[in-house]
């Protein structure tokens, strides 16, 4: 993976629905320009001038994990092309992502997931086993 990131100029995620978007987060940690859609969780972790606007679309039919009628983003392909052209014309190979680094640093991960999440679950378990609520 490191070799792929080293050879790349820019990371593009043009998805209709995305959770955190670990590929985009990994690229941001490596200070690559990142193009993402506004629909999903990536914008919570990555600040970039390249956020593609999305309309809403309903899925027309059931698929493996998805049901007809579910709503997803419908990213603007014209805006994607403008962002890609802009990054190319500026010859961007570096973009600082302090928010992403702060959210993914060891100290924050330990606090958010180990102390806050696991710690709270342990408190809930010990309270329930002692008969307290």
Per-segment meaning from a language model:
Residues 16:
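Aromatic "clamp/platform" in nucleotide-sugar-dependent glycosyltransferases that forms part
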Residues 33-36, 46, 50-53:
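Short hydrophobic beta-strand element within catalytic cores of glycosyltransferases
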């Amino acid at each position: 993976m490191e070799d792929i990131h080293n050879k790349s100029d820019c990371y593009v995620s043009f998805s209709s629905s995305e959770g955190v978007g670990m590929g985009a987060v990994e690229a941001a940690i490596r200070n690559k320009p990142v193009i993402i859609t506004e629909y999903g969780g990536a914008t919570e972790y990555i600040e970039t001038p390249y956020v593609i606007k999305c309309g809403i679309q309903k899925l027309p039919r059931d698929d493996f994990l998805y049901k007809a009628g579910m709503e997803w983003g419908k990213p603007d392909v014209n805006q994607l092309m403008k962002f890609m052209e802009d990054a190319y014309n500026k010859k961007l190979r570096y973009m600082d992502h302090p928010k992403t680094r702060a959210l993914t640093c060891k100290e924050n991960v330990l606090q958010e997931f180990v102390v806050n999440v696991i710690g709270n679950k342990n408190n809930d378990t010990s309270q329930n086993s002692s008969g307290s609520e």
